[in-house]
Every structure is written in C-alpha cells, then in structure tokens.
Swiss-Prot record:
GO terms for biological process: negative regulation of DNA-templated transcription. Keywords: Repressor, Stress response, Transcription, Transcription regulation. It comes from Clostridium beijerinckii (strain ATCC 51743 / NCIMB 8052). GO terms for molecular function: DNA binding. Belongs to the HrcA family. This is Heat-inducible transcription repressor HrcA.
Length: 342
C-alpha cells in the first residue's frame, strides 16, 4: 500500500495536533479542526491504513492515534513547515552574541549549551573543542618566580592550556627567556597537535641547545598534551527540562532517561551529525535507553573546520521545525564567534 496525498495530509495534521497538545488524535478532531474537505468516517479509515503502514500507533486502549517513529521520520523529511524565530528568541540570541564576545572558548561553549536548552526546553549536551583538531598558535613561557615558569599553549581554536614548570636553576633573564620563546615558537607554531612527533621533539631539543633544563621541563608537558589530545570536556544543560514532558511521567521511562543522561560518553556516541543538522528518531537510536527519544545533533566549526559536536535530546514529540531553526541559528552564531574573535 502506497501513501497517497490524502493520507499524507491527514498524517501531517495528526502530527501537528499531537505535537501541540500531547493528546492522542481521533478522526473527529482532524475533521473538526483541519479543513481537509473529507468527513470523519473517511479520515478514520485512512488512519487505520496509516496504522497498518506503520506511520501511526494506538497507545493503550485510547481511541486516538499518535505518530510512530516512522511517521515522525516522514514528517521531518518532507512534511513539516518552516518556522521563524520569535522576536524574543531573536533578541535572546543577539544578547548571547554580545555576552560571548570576550569569553574564553570553554565558557562560550558552556554558554551555548545553556542558551539552547533555554530556547528549546530540551536537554543540551556539547563537547569542548578537541585539541587534536587544533593547530598551535603560540607557546609562551612566563616567569612566576625565581624557580618556576608557567607555559601557556594557545591553539588556533582559542583553547588555552597552562602548566607549571619547576626548575632547579634560576629562571633565565627576560632577554634570554624571550629568545627561548622564539626558538620554541619557530619549531612548533602552525603544527597540529598530531604533527608533534619524535622528530619534531628531537629537533626542538637541538634548537634549545644549552637550555637543557627548559627542554626537560617542557618535554612532559608536550607528552601530556599529545596524550590528552582526544579528550574533551562535555557540558550538559537543562537536564531537568526533559522531565517536564508528560512522556516521562512513566517511572520506568524516566529511569532509562536518567541512566542515559548520567553517561555523557554514551550520550555523545549517539550524536552522529552528517551534513548540517541530523535528526535521529526513536528506534533509529541504537541505545535501548534512547528508543523513545529524538536526538538533534550537529557539528560546530572554526573557519569551516569541525571542532566539536552538539546535541539536543528530548521525547519524540517535539516541535522539530522550531528546534531545528533555533539550533541552526545558534550554531551559525557560535561558528562566527569562534572564527572571528573580537
């Protein structure tokens, strides 16, 4: 059985109504509230066909129907109408741009997560940029006291790593320390973290020559940076948002969701953005705890280079068009803030 234009219009009306109200939808509701030009009996028959085709489900003994994951998939891919931002949403995003202008990258990322959870009323999870994907912009050794330096690594994506370097000998004078910084930067700047290999390290050792203690103090920092290149920090905002949806009044569903939200690494594995924004619905999520969820995920970028993932998680019954519009606008502004810092 193929899905014809009339069935599509009925399915679209059912999903729009269910997203708005959260109540199972009956044929009389569609006939009364949507000008489809057909009667309740015909709609009822078409709804039975849509259920047989897997686009609708009948919860419990309810006379109404709700969309299945298959129904939502067709809706997201073909049927939903585009929505615009409200004036309030637009103003809130503009304020976010102002607030983020002078912040460090990690704080911008955390603020982005808070904004998305606020505007979408969903749970937002975002990872900080992976150092592995970054290039070294500068390294500075700065005197703390007579026997301590702090090394400051800055990547092109704005990630900053600080480490204390303890020396047995006195910290070199300012002019000498300036030359040492120049040597280190000449060797390492514009390399990606992945490109710092044994050959690069040996050449740096030769370049530093007489400053062996500086090299020996710097070496473990380089190794630590390499070993932690894949590590990212994960921020989560709006954890309780999802429990405002009646779908999670069921204690077993609520427990499953809490189990998923408490495992950030497992949650990040569910974020598999392809091109632009990716929506995975219900059974499309391979983890059992996420089978009743929808996940909207995307990558954010630095100068068109993806550097991190971001995702929203909620029930299957969400306003997909609105959520996708908000996410698209916020990520566009995040990419611009990161790529064009003030």
């Amino acid at each position: 059985m193929s899905i014809d234009d009339r069935k599509i219009r009925i399915l679209q009306a059912i999903i729009n109504d269910y997203i708005r109200t959260g109540d199972p939808v009956g044929s009389r509701t569609i006939a009364k509230n949507y000008n489809l030009g057909i009667g309740s009996a015909t709609i009822r028959n078409e709804m039975a066909d849509l259920e047989d085709m897997g686009y609708l489900e009948q919860p419990h003994a309810s006379a109404g129907r709700i969309p299945s994951s298959k129904g939502y998939r067709l809706y997201v891919d073909q049927l939903m109408d585009n929505q615009m931002l409200t004036v309030e949403e637009d103003l809130r995003i503009k304020q976010y741009i102002i607030d983020s202008a002078m912040l460090e990258v990690d704080k911008i990322v955390k603020q982005t997560s808070a904004l998305l959870s606020e505007l979408t009323k969903l749970t937002c999870v975002i990872e900080t940029p992976s150092v592995k994907r970054s290039f070294i912009k500068s390294i500075q050794l700065i005197k703390v006291d007579d026997h301590n330096l702090v090394s400051v690594f800055l990547t092109d994506t704005g990630v900053i790593k600080n480490h204390i370097m303890k020396l047995n000998n006195r910290v070199p004078e300012v002019e000498t320390l300036t030359r040492i910084n120049e040597v280190i930067n000449n060797r390492l700047v514009n390399l990606s973290i992945q490109e710092i290999n044994l050959e690069v390290i040996n050449n740096l050792k030769k370049d530093l020559g007489a400053y062996e203690e500086i090299f020996n103090a710097l070496l473990p920092i380089l190794y630590e940076t390499l070993n932690s290149a894949d590590s990212t920090e994960v921020f989560m905002e709006g954890t309780t948002n999802i429990f405002n949806y009646p779908e999670y009044n069921d204690i077993d569903k609520a427990k499953e969701m809490l189990s998923l939200l408490n495992d950030k690494e497992a949650l990040m594995e569910l974020f598999n953005p392809q091109d632009n924004i990716t929506v995975s619905i219900g059974d499309e999520n391979y983890k059992p705890q996420a089978r009743d969820c929808s996940i909207i995920s995307a990558e954010y970028s630095f100068k068109d280079r993806p550097i991190g993932k971001i995702g929203l998680i909620g029930p299957r019954r969400i306003n997909y068009s609105k959520v996708i519009m908000i996410m698209s606008e916020v990520i566009k502004e995040l990419n611009n803030i990161l790529s064009n810092p003030k």
